[in-house]
Curated annotation (Swiss-Prot):
Keywords: Amino-acid biosynthesis, Cytoplasm, Glutamine amidotransferase, Histidine biosynthesis, Hydrolase, Lyase. InterPro entries: Class_I_gatase-like, GATASE, Imidazole-glycPsynth_HisH. It is found in: Cytoplasm. IGPS catalyzes the conversion of PRFAR and glutamine to IGP, AICAR and glutamate. The HisH subunit catalyzes the hydrolysis of glutamine to glutamate and ammonia as part of the synthesis of IGP and AICAR. The resulting ammonia molecule is channeled to the active site of HisF. Pathway: Amino-acid biosynthesis; L-histidine biosynthesis; L-histidine from 5-phospho-alpha-D-ribose 1-diphosphate: step 5/9. This is Imidazole glycerol phosphate synthase subunit HisH. The keyword Repeat does not apply. Pfam families: GATase. Heterodimer of HisH and HisF. Its EC number is 4.3.2.10, 3.5.1.2. It comes from the Bacteria.
């Protein structure tokens, strides 16, 4: 199986690479359209600001390439946020628009921001991405912006208020947390994605 980690220019690709390798796969890091479109599974990790990430995608001519993908794509952290229509970050920017929902600055409910550390998720019953992962399982989060609950939400987390922890639309999946840093539960989620 061809597993590709998209070289977005805005991510720590090594931790995702190692996590995929531990599951017995040999991922390729690439931004070559031929390699990306031939992939059976595509990971889209991202860290940093949405503005800088979209600029990297623009410079690398990846925006239309991502939108044209028909295989399962998993956006991780900022990679998930980029699937939204817009982000309030950097004064408001347009993002990829696969999920019809915005990403908003998290509200200060007296809890430390950014939201950093382990938190529990509640997943949609029977969703394939969360197979074998019980409700209440902890995943590792690092973010100050979040997608509100929307029709494409498949898992949510509460941090002062509920927000989208995972999203799915057609072949596009996204997780706000870092599965590659979430121990056995994160490995199970990545395995579920790779076995779709």
């Amino acid at each position: 199986m061809d597993v590709v980690i998209l070289d977005t220019g805005c991510a720590n690709l090594s931790s995702v690479t190692y996590a995929v390798q531990r599951l017995g796969y040999t991922p390729v890091i690439s931004r070559d359209p031929a390699v990306v479109l031939r992939a059976d599974k595509l990971f889209m990790p991202g860290v940093g600001t949405a503005h800088a990430a979209m600029e990297q995608l623009r410079q690398r001519e990846l925006i239309e390439l991502i939108k044209s993908c028909t295989q399962p794509v998993l956006g991780i952290c900022l990679g998930m946020q980029l699937l939204a229509t817009s982000s309030e970050e950097s004064g408001g920017i347009t993002t990829l628009g696969m999920i019809d929902a915005p990403v908003k600055k998290m509200t200060d409910f007296g809890l430390p921001l950014p939201h950093m550390g382990w938190n529990q998720i509640t997943a949609q019953a029977g969703n394939h991405l969360f197979r074998g992962i019980p409700d209440g399982t902890y995943f590792y989060f690092v973010h100050g912006y979040a997608m509100p609950i929307c029709p494409n939400t498949i898992a949510q987390t509460n941090y002062g208020e509920p927000f989208t922890a995972a999203v799915e639309k057609d072949n596009f999946f996204g997780v706000q947390f870092h599965p590659e840093r979430s121990g056995a539960a994160g490995a199970q989620l990545m395995k579920n994605f790779l076995e779709m």
